[in-house]
Amino acid sequence: MIKFRRFPYKHNLAFIIFIGILLSIINALWAFLLSIAETENGNFVVVSLSMALGFLIIPLSLFLLKHKRIYLNYYAIATGIAFGVANAVLISIFSYRDSVVVYSLITPTIIIFVLMDMLINKTKIKKRNAIKFLFGGMIATIGFVLLAFNSLNLSLITTYDVVIAIFLIVIYGMASFLLTQTGLKSKSNYSSITTIAIFEIITMLLFIPFSGYGFSFAGLQFSFIAGLIVSIGMIIGFLGYNSIQKSSHAIAYSSIMYILSEMETVFLVIFYSIFVERLSVFAFFSIMLIIIAVWYLSKESDTAFH
């Protein structure tokens, strides 16, 4: 079994970048499988719960094997609740919107992540350099917005789509920040991940009255596998968080890891463009801006944080 706190890549930027890119691939596969599950099943709560159960199995099993007590982590509880709400809403719209379109609409979550980082960790970010941190987040945000223009037909976007997109941008940005704080402060990784999964399930149960009462097993194998995959991704992500715990680079490097993990939209757009032959110059500009944001944050990590 992996010993998290003895992992050798201490404060290694290359390792953080590798983890971020790996997470983006995992997230892309997760979104693809969930969109299939919702299309085949149609009941977003059933699909959400199936995914959450798949997410729970691996960390819970590893936690029970270690026979350690549960550490009550309020960040983990808040993370589970936030992801429960966000994922339930996201899955509910997969039945009538292409997953690429949905992800393109909600890509600017990084700006919420950065703003929360600045608010919660304001004592750890040098005041005179806070604007630099925000600037790095804005570069990445612009990159993701440009990426959205590659796959969206704006004439088909409704006011309802915009409202839902804004809600998901805020809630996913908050959830991702809370997840990062959970990883950076965690005393027991499997306990924290298990707590997230349990509270995600509890939150999703609250959506049952909005789902109707039809039940079907159709497509649930895809959502369950998606849950298994994302649990592996979260365990891998905690390797990254643990490698920078108590480091002066923690804020910048965790932001870099999050920015890169959000690049699943890049993979979804490229995959989508292969079939519709619609890969515009926006996609290349967006990727370049994301790379620049990563470089800028890594460069400023030596001066802007303490």
Descriptions of predicted regions:
Residues 1, 128-151, 281-301:
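Hydrophobic transmembrane alpha-helices of multi-pass small-molecule transport proteins
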